[in-house]
């Protein structure tokens, strides 16, 4: 069979390492793409490149996914200001940007064949497949799903498959399944999957309470039209801001939680997650919005935001409704300009100061203190504002009498 080009989303792990010889034996010339979304250091990037070469790929490409994940997801998530089911901040949404990198490479090679290493048991397969299908007429090959039709112990099968072909398997035993990127870390497996208390080993960036600094941390974040642009007065790119906030707030244990929720495929999922930088950004942005948006904006916007979050979580990243909702979210940010001061003493973060020319206040008015209207005006407002409830009570009280 003549070789056909196929582009594989590659991470260097067991699953995607297995995919390379498997696809080659199906007659494909395998081209790998590693989209670095912030979860590896330089040594790991080097390992991934060498691993791809060792396994015999036709070409390998490493893509800096930081700018894409900021512009394509983080900005919109912060505008939305919501988490999935009120808690989980969508930490594996880098999958959509990985798909974009894979499809760009496929288009450059003139092929419609793409592959990923997702299993047939989780959410990621849905996100990968829907994101691919939404962007063109591509052929999706998912080798791990294929072998699950015949093998129950797939990882053991993959390991044996590689060893039989002379490829080593990385001796890196992990008690947990870990996903790490610029957004944060998720951990599952072990006692987490057994609905038990996570052990101390189930920890990524966030320091335990015993290691928190004794002095409080104060950080100022500047926003322009809802986008963070500077930290403590220093302009930074989006990815730089998130990296800096991750480091600062992780040392105080901020952004760590245990989440149980409804997965795309209908099962209950349980993870430990850590998102120190995102937690800080969301806290600061929400405090600024509270001060500068109108009452009606602050009431209505969460409805839009929750739907946007649901679409992203469930794989509908390219659905037209998501684009429609983002148009509203972006419009709502026109006056979200200012600087928020955050403070943490460990475990949680609070917005302690707000500076903005758009704060909706009046020189002559301070809530519950002073006002530039008279007593009669206040009484008249209360009478009209509560008219419906007052009439209801009056009418029905008369009927009962």
UniProtKB/Swiss-Prot annotation:
ATP binds at residues 9-17, 35, 117. The keyword ATP-binding applies. The keyword Secreted does not apply. It catalyses: L-citrulline + L-aspartate + ATP = 2-(N(omega)-L-arginino)succinate + AMP + diphosphate + H(+). Keywords: Amino-acid biosynthesis, Arginine biosynthesis, ATP-binding, Cytoplasm, Ligase, Nucleotide-binding. GO terms for molecular function: argininosuccinate synthase activity; ATP binding. It is an enzyme of class 6 (ligase). Disulfide bonds: none annotated. InterPro entries: Arginosuc_syn_C (IPR048268), Arginosuc_syn_N (IPR048267), Arginosuc_synth (IPR001518), Arginosuc_synth_CS (IPR018223), Arginosuc_synth_type_1_subfam (IPR023434), AS_cat/multimer_dom_body (IPR024074), Rossmann-like_a/b/a_fold (IPR014729). Belongs to the argininosuccinate synthase family. Type 1 subfamily. Homotetramer. This is Argininosuccinate synthase.
């Amino acid at each position: 069979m003549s070789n056909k080009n196929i582009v594989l989303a590659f991470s260097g792990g067991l699953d995607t390492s297995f995919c390379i010889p498997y696809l080659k034996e199906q007659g494909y010339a395998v081209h790998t793409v590693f989209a670095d979304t912030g979860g590896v250091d330089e040594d790991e990037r080097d390992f991934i490149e060498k691993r791809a070469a060792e396994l015999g790929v036709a070409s390998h490409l490493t893509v800096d996914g930081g700018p894409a994940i900021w512009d394509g997801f983080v900005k919109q998530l912060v505008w939305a200001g919501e988490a999935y089911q009120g808690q989980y901040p969508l930490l594996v949404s880098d999958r959509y940007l990985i798909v974009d990198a894979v499809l760009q490479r496929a288009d450059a090679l003139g092929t419609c064949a793409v592959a990923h290493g997702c299993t047939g048991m989780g959410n990621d397969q849905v996100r990968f497949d829907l994101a691919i299908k939404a962007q063109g007429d591509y052929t999706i090959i998912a080798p791990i799903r294929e072998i699950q039709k015949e093998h129950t112990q797939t990882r053991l099968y993959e390991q044996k498959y590689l060893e039989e072909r002379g490829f080593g398997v990385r001796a890196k035993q992990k008690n947990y399944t870990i996903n790490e990127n610029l957004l944060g870390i998720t951990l599952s497996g072990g006692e987490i999957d057994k609905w038990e208390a996570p052990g101390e080993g189930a920890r990524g960036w966030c320091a335990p309470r015993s290691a928190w600094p004794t002095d409080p941390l104060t950080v100022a974040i500047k926003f322009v039209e809802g986008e963070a642009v500077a930290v403590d007065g220093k302009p930074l790119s989006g990815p730089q801001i998130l990296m800096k906030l991750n480091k600062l707030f992780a040392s105080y244990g901020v952004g760590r939680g245990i989440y149980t929720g409804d997965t795309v495929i209908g099962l209950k999922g349980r993870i430990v997650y850590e998102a120190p930088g995102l937690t800080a950004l969301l806290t600061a942005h929400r405090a600024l919005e509270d001060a500068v948006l109108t009452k009606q904006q602050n009431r209505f916007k969460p409805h839009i935001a929750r739907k946007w979050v649901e679409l992203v979580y469930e794989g509908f990243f390219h659905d037209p409704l998501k684009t429609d909702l983002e148009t509203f979210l972006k419009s709502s940010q026109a006056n979200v300009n200012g600087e928020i001061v955050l403070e943490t003493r460990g475990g949680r973060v609070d917005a302690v100061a707000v500076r903005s020319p758009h704060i909706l206040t009046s020189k002559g008015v301070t809530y519950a203190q002073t006002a530039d209207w008279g007593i009669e005006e206040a009484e008249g407002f209360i009478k009209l504002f509560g008219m419906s409830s007052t009439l209801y009570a009056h009418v029905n009280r008369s009927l009962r009498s």
